[in-house]
Amino acid sequence: MALDIHAHRILILDFGSQYTQLIARRVREIGVYCELHPFDMDDEAIREFNPRGIILAGGPESVHEANSPRAPQAVFDLNVPVLGICYGMQTMAEQMGGKVEGSDLREFGYARVDVVGKSRLLDGIEDHVDDDGVLGLDVWMSHGDKVTQMPGNFNILASTPSCPIAGMYDDVRGYYGVQFHPEVTHTKQGGRILSRFVQDICGCEALWTASNIVEDAIAQVRAQVGSANVLLGLSGGVDSSVVAALLHRAIGDQLTCVFVDNGLLRLHEGDQVMAMFKENMGVKVIRADAEKQFLDNLAGEADPEKKRKIIGRTFIDVFDAEASKLENIQFLAQGTIYPDVIESAGAKSGKAHVIKSHHNVGGLPEEMNLKLVEPLRELFKDEVRKIGLELGLPYDMVYRHPFPGPGLGVRILGEVKKEYADILRRADHIFIEELRKADWYHKTSQAFVVFQPVKSVGVVGDGRRYAWVVALRAVETVDFMTARWAHLPYELLETVSGRIINEIDGISRVTYDVSSKPPATIEWE
């Protein structure tokens, strides 16, 4: 009988915290399947989900405000362990008969909590032991309200001078609350705390591993598709590449990929995609050379949003044209991943969680009467990368920096022309090459060159040159919501600038973008 890698599962209820997806990722890293659902998930759905344990996440609300979110009653009726984090602890306390009050002294940022009680959750986990034998943890706090009275049968788990009940526990029922955030890296022992809850207290086995996920996905694809043929739009990005590798392993020649070369890709990227999938892996790939069509459609357009729409529409036209030549296609594969499935804006209200529609190939599913195959829809990006490696994709492909869907079309400011794209491709290639040589590529989260349609005077030998300006952009980020410009060494910047100006005819000046996000965005358009 096949292994059920979803059998041991944790339910995470979202009350609107910016950290909620991080909790899910941490639980998955432990090797346990979990799902994220809105706090108002109905009781029947919770029972049907049948979790081994439940985590109540944080949120921006105050429990003593009217209509503030509450955990469903089923959470406390299932007789499974429950961990409340921040707001989750507060609503647990309030709903079970305790008391929560606003605090004059809010705690945001690093804090040290003293471990007070002898609980299963924190037993043997500490960062410090003081002279009196008191155990301490370095944690990350982000709260205004605090629990001032615990429900019956609870004991104090942890304490700070301004928050005497910074944690509470009832070992008999397996109920725990912590006012700090174990899911963020600033809480040094956070991984151990979550592992203790998920594995030791909830009894979950680590079945959620890369090799098991691949086997499970292959079995599901085969069961869904049978002997039918599947179409995939292959971009060369991480998600579509992993889908291609996974489907090829699952169904072989039943998969046909269409790779649209729009003339806005990185240097040699089209050839690399074809070499990897068609030549090395034997995947059926149709390459549609549509550079002229894209550039013709973009001619004269300088508005960034309109450029994006033109590129999107042209992609659909080209993809449709290629797909219509194929026979007996019944399924369309897409690289939808789990964060796409979770409605991001819904985290604020907690009630707007809907499944996004992902017709990233336009109206094709309806027009061609195709059914969708989305083998990555349960996975976070870091999990997609891990299974990419498991499937034999090269590390450099799987851990490549993000590249926007419209490609160089949004890295050329203003109107897109072939001349600009050719110059930018070469400049970007030099920048990335030098980052790799200096061991800076994987220290940055994203790095690229921007073409500016501005000319500047330069001197070459005894002659004057009037040529284009480009900007280097490199950032460091964890989540791409905020980003810091990368503090690259001056010597590296000097090398990159020198090579670009000397090796590329048409560039006279190289600048470096030192804007962080916010206020600037990572991409320029």
Curated annotation (Swiss-Prot):
Subunit structure, as described in the record: Homodimer.
Protein name: GMP synthase [glutamine-hydrolyzing]
Gene Ontology, cellular component aspect: cytosol
Domain Glutamine amidotransferase type-1: 9-207
Binding site for ATP: S235, G236, G237, V238, D239, S240, S241
Domain GMPS ATP-PPase span(s) in chain numbering: 208-400
Enzyme class, first EC level, given as a word: ligase
Reactions it catalyzes: XMP + L-glutamine + ATP + H2O = GMP + L-glutamate + AMP + diphosphate + 2 H(+)
This protein's record includes keyword Flavoprotein: no
UniProt cross-references to Pfam families, sorted A to Z: GATase (PF00117), GMP_synt_C (PF00958), NAD_synthase (PF02540)
